[in-house]
A protein has these predicted regions:
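C-terminal intramolecular chaperone/autoprocessing and neck/assembly modules of extracellular spikes
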Residues: 1-85, 102-106
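Long amphipathic alpha-helical coiled-coil
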Residues: 89, 93-107
Length: 107
């Protein structure tokens, strides 16, 4: 791809003209229900060079996301999994829409 412009901050290139094979995420609610929100304490020294190393935090488990086949999981050189939380937002949007349809059906 040529002439790609990097965008700083939380902006993500998302132009429809750059995409193909666009489909709605199926069974998003089931996928979200399979994930668990957790509280945890980082092990000493992790994440490396982070101000929250050894402190309490909240998050999800990368291996759970990966097992669902969702995008946004990568591995560090050390083999640790990372999660791109912003890649989960489209799944959550579709899950909310599925849940909303269920609520509407009750009316």
């Amino acid at each position: 791809m040529k002439n790609v412009v990097g965008i700083g901050g939380d902006m993500t290139l998302s132009d429809q003209n750059l995409k193909e094979n666009i489909t709605i995420i199926p069974n998003a609610l089931d996928k979200v229900k399979s994930l668990t929100g957790n509280t945890f304490k980082w092990k000493d020294g992790y994440p490396a060079n982070a101000t929250n190393a050894g402190s309490n935090d909240t998050g999800i488990i990368a291996q759970e996301v990966e097992a669902l086949g969702l995008a946004g999981i990568t591995s560090t050189r050390d083999g640790y999994k990372t999660v791109s939380y912003k890649r989960l937002i489209p799944v959550m949007i579709e899950a909310i829409k599925e849940l909303s349809a269920k609520v509407d059906a009750l009316s």
